[in-house]
Amino acid sequence: IKEGQDRAGGNENTEKALEALGDILHAVYSNKNGMTTVGQETALLKAYVDIMQMRFGSSFQYYNVIPTELFYYEIPAFTMQPIVENAILHGVKGVTAGQIIVSAIEYENDFVISVFNNGNSADKKKIEDLLKGEKNQRAVTGIGLYNVNSRLKLLYGESYGLIYNEKVRNGFEIWVRLPKKITESEER
């Protein structure tokens, strides 16, 4: 009986993983102009996190506390996924009671997304070098962070992109600064 229950649970997990993978692939192939909404991006993140929790045995908790009124803002597709991936692989993986919290606030004509994890912190100089594109840092790790930062700066200018919150002592936090722009399909 136990063996049958194990298999049934395995099938359920396989079904969940395939559904999450389908959600991710749908996001990839349905995106024609490279832009999406914060709401769609957070749905993609949830699917990605579901897969990673299956992979690592739910060793961390994920919380999305972005206010729904910000869900209609435009964001380049796959902006948050590499940051959350970094938080999982370099922050909370192997940490007891690891947490990743994604939040956002409006700030003047911009909005800022925060990705915080309570796991391992990082060296300020290494992160700054990585975000600037220092070759020796990109070769080791963080190519996703570098790519996201570069893409945001190219799209919106030097005042936008990733900002490392150096004041966090227990954990790691990256801010994503973006201009407020509601997607054309959501404008009323």
Residue ranges with predicted function:
Residues K167-R188:
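C-terminal end segment of the histidine kinase catalytic
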Residues I1-N165, F172-W175:
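Two-component histidine phosphotransfer core
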